[in-house]
Design a protein with these regions (language model features):
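Generic long, charged, amphipathic alpha-helical segments
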Residues: 134, 143-168
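A cross-taxa feature marking solvent-exposed loop/turn segments within ectodomains of secreted
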Residues: 70-72, 160, 175-177
Length: 225
């Protein structure tokens, strides 16, 4: 049994980051950087890079591994993940704001779910290897106001938690002085839909955290010299 637990704390100074297009529009809707048609329709926002004030963040990384022998082969079980306690950034008032657990459509931070974890179970038996992975992302929320259309379709500001399962099988055999490894696998084998996010006029999803492609099956062959 192996257990690892790490606490980390980082204080960034003068972080170089890109401006938030949504933040520019919200703060100065008629600024030169905001491009509109003659009738006032928004068509684009010119953004640039700037030095942000201090950014403070801390959290915990954890990992648990356990292995044992069976009549079928060697089994490895694992749990790893990260929990972010805070991610403080400056806001327009010159104060700090903790943006953990938010989609962050209106600032330079990315979407920040509090917790992400991976469960694993691996069986090694001679030339055979079977691996199962479960990936969990905790829920978070968007602070963007919902339109009446979004509400009528059942959208809320909550972005649901997501759990997906990957499966992979490998078979390795000798050929002359080399080895050949055959692989068959699936990503998101349960075909779990990515949580929907109401983002501006689009009924979209968070590409930084979730995968909208659904179930993906693959095969592979590898020559090992």
């Amino acid at each position: 049994l192996e257990i690892k637990l790490d606490y980390w704390s980082i204080d960034y100074s003068d972080v170089i980051t890109i401006e938030s297009a949504q933040g520019i529009v919200a703060a100065t809707p008629l600024a030169p950087a905001v491009k509109r048609t003659i009738d006032g329709t928004l068509i684009g926002v010119t953004t640039g890079y700037f030095n942000a004030s201090n950014v403070k963040t801390d959290g915990i990384d954890f990992e648990v591994n356990y292995s044992f022998d069976t009549s079928f082969g060697d089994v490895e079980l694992g749990l790893s993940g990260s929990h972010m306690n805070k991610y403080e950034i400056p806001n327009a008032k010159g104060e700090t704001q903790d943006v953990v657990g938010l989609f962050n459509h209106d600032n330079f931070a990315r979407s920040l779910p509090e917790t992400k974890m991976t469960l694993s179970a691996i069986l090694n038996s001679g030339p055979h290897k079977l691996a199962l992975y479960g990936k969990h992302i905790s829920d978070y929320k968007t602070t963007r106001a919902l339109s009446d259309t979004a509400k009528s379709r059942g959208y809320t500001q909550k972005i649901d938690e997501w759990f997906s399962v990957d499966l992979q099988y490998n078979y390795t055999f000798d050929m002359d002085d080399n080895q050949i490894r055959l692989t068959l696998g699936g990503i998101n084998i349960l075909d779990e839909d990515a949580p929907l996010v109401f983002d501006a006029a689009n009924f979209s999803y968070d590409s930084r955290q979730h995968d909208i492609r659904g179930r993906i099956m693959y095969v592979g062959i590898k020559l090992i010299r």
